[in-house]
Amino acid sequence: MQSKVTGNMPTQSLLMYMDGPEVIGSSLGSPMEMEDALSMKGTAVVPFRATQEKNVIQIEGYMPLDCMFCSQTFTHSEDLNKHVLMQHRPTLCEPAVLRVEAEYLSPLDKSQVRTEPPKEKNCKENEFSCEVCGQTFRVAFDVEIHMRTHKDSFTYGCNMCGRRFKEPWFLKNHMRTHNGKSGARSKLQQGLESSPATINEVVQVHAAESISSPYKICMVCGFLFPNKESLIEHRKVHTKKTAFGTSSAQTDSPQGGMPSSREDFLQLFNLRPKSHPETGKKPVRCIPQLDPFTTFQAWQLATKGKVAICQEVKESGQEGSTDNDDSSSEKELGETNKGSCAGLSQEKEKCKHSHGEAPSVDADPKLPSSKEKPTHCSECGKAFRTYHQLVLHSRVHKKDRRAGAESPTMSVDGRQPGTCSPDLAAPLDENGAVDRGEGGSEDGSEDGLPEGIHLDKNDDGGKIKHLTSSRECSYCGKFFRSNYYLNIHLRTHTGEKPYKCEFCEYAAAQKTSLRYHLERHHKEKQTDVAAEVKNDGKNQDTEDALLTADSAQTKNLKRFFDGAKDVTGSPPAKQLKEMPSVFQNVLGSAVLSPAHKDTQDFHKNAADDSADKVNKNPTPAYLDLLKKRSAVETQANNLICRTKADVTPPPDGSTTHNLEVSPKEKQTETAADCRYRPSVDCHEKPLNLSVGALHNCPAISLSKSLIPSITCPFCTFKTFYPEVLMMHQRLEHKYNPDVHKNCRNKSLLRSRRTGCPPALLGKDVPPLSSFCKPKPKSAFPAQSKSLPSAKGKQSPPGPGKAPLTSGIDSSTLAPSNLKSHRPQQNVGVQGAATRQQQSEMFPKTSVSPAPDKTKRPETKLKPLPVAPSQPTLGSSNINGSIDYPAKNDSPWAPPGRDYFCNRSASNTAAEFGEPLPKRLKSSVVALDVDQPGANYRRGYDLPKYHMVRGITSLLPQDCVYPSQALPPKPRFLSSSEVDSPNVLTVQKPYGGSGPLYTCVPAGSPASSSTLEGKRPVSYQHLSNSMAQKRNYENFIGNAHYRPNDKKT
């Protein structure tokens, strides 16, 4: 019977379970046979229902024995043991931490159906019964479905470890802990599978061996091992028993040696035997599953410290202080300690290895020093569980000896050299020395202490070669990730606040606190500070000079001057090497606060601080010079359009005399030290003295004291911008200080409304007033000669002499903003001279005075009967425009458009197209008509049409103009009211094919004959400005028909 039982038992032996420490010893301790021992141990191990009589050894035959896993009952214990070993082996063989005790199982939990359920006598071979309610089924799938009706049954079990679950997804998640795969296959190994596993529709029969777990589990840490040998080897880690205690005695005893005496002898002298082939290897290395580099599970357990209950527990502070820069110091550098501390640690290490103690998994086996840290105090003899507690305790002894020592702030971490015990000297110094060096680099030596220069020593005087970092606070023992945070924390104990606000008395221990204070309370002042900080990266000298010059604004300037003797107190050569950087940014940086009225105030404010008295003289002197010079240049650029009488001194108090004295001061400084003059000049050239925002320092506000203000001559209005003053004078005083500029603006407004004239073929040109204007009246001192003689002088100019009149115009037609400040004189003389000049240059013109509107019709019609058939007949326009003879058709047709686009100044004489004598006659008649009406206004009307004529038809180099040296009164007139020399103004009465048609009123007497084809003609009944505007618009409208008209 016994052989039959052993033959049917699972292949996995129960020796580990029977011989292990988890065996529950029975009261019967006499040696028995195997079957009796098995049965007795099974009786002891398999618990029964929680009743007192069940706890007593059952006597066969008196009461039935119930199985704890199912509802079957047995009369003999042997049968019960066989049943448990056969049917419930996975649950039985699991460790105590995973086994389910019988007391906690409900009756429904006992009904567990296996793959091969026992065939009872009352069940047929092809039927399956429910062990909970006894219902039978033909198919195992139906039994599994039926089992789900019993809610409390643990239907799903793990075939690896034996744990059972009520829900399938619990089992699925559990299976991932074993192999990382889904637990779907575990259903096949339950009792009464719903659908057996098939391969190509072939049902796979599961052997009984697959039910058992192929892994061994450690009862302490729960780690799995593939075989029993590896599990036993692993247990040595927990029990701290080496192989010498179990196997070495057995292996050494046959050799006849003295193993015990030899080991004692070696331990006495702290010697280690030569590596034994069996015992030389560490137990940890004998377990490949525990190698963190082999399995992830072992690494995870090793890093979390759950593999073994080590003698030395990893310190939480050291775990938290793993910094990228400091944490690897202990692992990267080997410790080479000397002295008694090293000897003691080596002795302890050898003792441990001689006994075969396995080191902690969390420590690197390559570093023997990781286990050398003592755990007892050598001064008072107290023992501690961890090294960290010993470190905290050692401070008690250090504080007792700190009476006459330095203050804790003299070192970053507060440690004093030579105050630790021999056992703690090496570790404490390791953790402290590098702290100083790294603290200086991380914290930037903010405390101003000579960090990193101390070398801690042991009591024996030996220097520590290996320096590691400790981030423990010497006052409260807290650990920190880096020395930066340790230094900040130490300030809470020492009360040090190195970060001081430069605007108030606030001081902070951290940079972030100061930054928050500045943003909350001094946000306005932060603009200048941010600009200075921005310049720090570009040039350190720039920052020094800016802070030196900004002495009166901030308190930070005082701190700077205390340590800036090398900047301002240096020789001139060194000063000027650093100062030009200020000159480039003097307008953009807040060198002088707005409160400084002049440079004298700057000296006075700078002298208020005693620290600034020595440094005051060199820098502000040159800044004073630069300020004056910049004021002069800015005033010259911004007020160039104003007259000398309107120039007012800047509000900063520097008068014209002071501005003139500045070159002398510059020469004085240059003579004092001429070595830096070239460097200053080279830095002055790219100075940006414009009023606009500076690009190099946009965040710096421009000091208003450096910008000269402009005062209105009519009131007390002041402004920094000429444009604002001009708008103020126009709106408030109805006056424009720049007459020529005003005329130019109006001309641009009227003449440029429609863009470039079509005759220019898209080539846009500026107004003629900005290029060609007649020369002053000095070119024609006396114009009272007879008209024929004047005509005889001016008519013959050929192609080479044509620039005479154009050259005369050039000076007056210069840009108006350059002539705006010139005083105008001799108004009447210029008017008369201009009228005579126009009469001589253009003999056929007839100028009608603008005020005498009643004479205009007469002057318009008088020249007509004089020579109606003459092609050179001249007549005056209603607005006083000068009319010129039109060319014949033969000379007009070939040039065509070239007359307007590509005319040269040499063709001015030939433009009239008629002989000179003929033109003289007509001019005499035309001028005789206009002579009686000569008055002051006549001088105005000539330039009225000067601009429009020049813009619309002629290029700048093609025009022949009268002298434009006119009194200032005409400047109030718009340039569009001034007509250019109207070379083509008058056409022949019969010349309908002229290049221009002009819209003339139908009721005008001369609209059909004389004025036909004439260039813009104004109306008699309209004012000058309105008529001129309409004339210009008519001309623009008819200009598109020029090429066609010339051909007809």
Curated annotation (Swiss-Prot):
GO biological process per UniProt: negative regulation of DNA-templated transcription; negative regulation of transcription by RNA polymerase II; regulation of DNA-templated transcription
Crosslink feature (Glycyl lysine isopeptide (Lys-Gly) (interchain with G-Cter in SUMO2)) location: K819
Keyword check for Acyltransferase: no
SUPFAM superfamilies: beta-beta-alpha zinc fingers
Main location (coarse class): nucleus
Molecular function (Gene Ontology), one example: DNA-binding transcription factor activity, RNA polymerase II-specific
Record's subunit section: Component of a histone deacetylase complex that contains HDAC2, KDM1A, CTBP1 and ZNF217. May be a component of a BHC histone deacetylase complex that contains HDAC1, HDAC2, HMG20B/BRAF35, KDM1A, RCOR1/CoREST, PHF21A/BHC80, ZMYM2, ZNF217, ZMYM3, GSE1 and GTF2I. Interacts with CTBP1 and CTBP2.
Protein name: Zinc finger protein 217
Lineage: Eukaryota, Metazoa, Chordata, Craniata, Vertebrata
